[in-house]
Amino acid sequence: MKNRVTVPEIIASKGKRKLSELTAYDYPTALWADQSGIDMLLVGDSLAMVVLGHDDTLSVGMTEMLHHTSAVARGAKRALVIGDMPFMSYQVSVEEALYNAGLFLKEAKAQAVKLEGGRRVAPQVKAMVEAGIPVQGHLGLTPQSSAQFGGFKIQGKTAEAAKILIEDAQILAEAGCFSIVLEGIPSNVAAMVTEAIPVPTIGIGAGPDCDGQVLVIHDVLGLYDRFVPKFVKKYAQLGLTIKEALTKYREEVENGTFPGPEHEFGMAELEAKKLSGLEDKK
């Protein structure tokens, strides 16, 4: 078993090797991803959609996020575990943001947190980093702000918007972010951001020039039954495999072939005779 991936190692990887990041929401998934050598596991607020069935990421709070982050932390022995700060857990004040971020490390045993936004959250990032809490930033298509964007729309498509995005990345890096997720932005803009900051960029729908990539594990494995973004590559169709297995289970229960003799527990012959005798005396 390799040692835990650390924040300094993530930062030092820039320009040397590509980083892999995936979401995870429970113990077994974290275990499998960890054994696959994934560098970072993000307990994303996408939990709301792909695990709990909500229509957006706004429907989870600190209680759910801490609960699932704890499960992932128990399964991941090598990967860096990052807790995603849910909507309104860091926007109200720097003090509240710092307190909630601390809960991810103290109670849920994560090694870092992630939050969305540019310069407006720089004070929160700075306070967290000064308190010893590593922070991953998130720019571009930030799902918690989808209502403001008018839906899940690509960001940074104009020269002015791209300029602001690059500046935001620089501000976040200066505030102390150890990496920054770039979601749903043009590839050339992502390349410019990557060149402009000293910490790794992690792309999701941001092209091949980022320092690493992140995807939602349910999308990767074909486990989500709703819309899958263009930038997703499905590496398996486990949803269909699960459906086939469960259909076979139901059929075998109905036709009596499960459980078979190999699934039964027996009783010693002498004890069986005693039991039969006891029944006969009734």
From Swiss-Prot:
Query: Which biological pathway?
Result: Cofactor biosynthesis; (R)-pantothenate biosynthesis; (R)-pantoate from 3-methyl-2-oxobutanoate: step 1/2
Cofactor(s) recorded for this entry are: Mg(2+)
An example of a GO molecular function for this protein is: magnesium ion binding
The entry's 3-methyl-2-oxobutanoate-binding residues are: 45-46, 84, 114
Question: EC?
Answer: 2.1.2.11
Q: Which UniProt keywords apply?
A: Cytoplasm, Magnesium, Metal-binding, Pantothenate biosynthesis, Transferase
This protein's source sits in the domain of life called Bacteria
What this protein catalyses is: 3-methyl-2-oxobutanoate + (6R)-5,10-methylene-5,6,7,8-tetrahydrofolate + H2O = 2-dehydropantoate + (6S)-5,6,7,8-tetrahydrofolate
Q: Where does Mg(2+) bind?
A: 45, 84, 116
Localized where?
Cytoplasm
The reply to whether Metal-binding figures as a keyword in the UniProt entry is: yes
Query: What Pfam families does the entry give?
Result: Pantoate_transf (PF02548)
User: Can you tell me which residues form the catalytic site?
Assistant: 183
Which terms does the UniProt entry file under GO BP? pantothenate biosynthetic process
Q: Which GO terms describe its cellular component?
A: cytoplasm
Under Gene3D superfamilies, the record lists:
Phosphoenolpyruvate-binding domains
**What does the entry's cofactor note say about binding and number?**
Binds 1 Mg(2+) ion per subunit.
Enzyme class comes to: transferase
Subunit notes for this chain?
A: Homodecamer; pentamer of dimers.
Its biological function? Catalyzes the reversible reaction in which hydroxymethyl group from 5,10-methylenetetrahydrofolate is transferred onto alpha-ketoisovalerate to form ketopantoate.
Q: What family is this?
A: Belongs to the PanB family.
Q: Which HAMAP family match?
A: PanB
**How is this protein named in the record?**
3-methyl-2-oxobutanoate hydroxymethyltransferase
Q: Which organism is it from?
A: Syntrophobacter fumaroxidans (strain DSM 10017 / MPOB)
